[in-house]
Amino acid sequence: MTLGKTKNRKRNVITSLELDPAIMEQNNIRFQSTYKRISENEVRFEEINCENADYLIVAFGSMSRICQKTIELAAEEGIKIGLLRPITLWPFPTEAIARHANHVKGILSAELNAGQMVEDVRLAVNGKVRVEHSDV
């Protein structure tokens, strides 16, 4: 609990733990409302060449820059690849990825880590298309 220097100030409890079930339920409802509002208004991503893509790469950070060059080289060979670059990982661009699952042949989750994003991509497509992972 923080009060600062002012003793008359309302308490600011810094925890989500509440032992009273009624208050805990109200807190959870408030948290879920906040999460929903954030998910609706704060998701950010960039789509590059996704309109007519046969394949989609989902990549963020440094890997997305590498993948941009990859889709340029693939285009020279006649391969249509799009890039979806999440700018926010939370909230994740689930709906945008799900839309592309209806028209691409496959999705690659390209990451410079052990695969923290690939499961989110798989959840987004809900089995509609195969999702592979590359951890270069």
Q: Where in this protein do the model-derived segments appear?
A:
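Conformationally flexible catalytic loops at phosphate/diphosphate-handling active centers
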Residues: 1-47
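Acidic beta-strand-to-loop metal/phosphate-binding motif
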Residues: 105-111
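Short, conserved loop/helix-junction motifs that constitute active-site signature segments
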Residues: 98-103
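Short, glycine-/Ser/Thr-/acidic-enriched flexible segments
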Residues: 62-64, 88-89, 113-115, 136
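Redox- and metal-dependent alpha/beta enzyme cores, enriched for Fe-S-associated oxidoreductases
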Residues: 44-79, 84, 90-96
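A short helix->loop->beta-strand "cap" motif at the edges of active sites that frequently abuts
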Residues: 104-105, 129
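Peripheral docking tails and interdomain loops at the edges
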Residues: 111-136
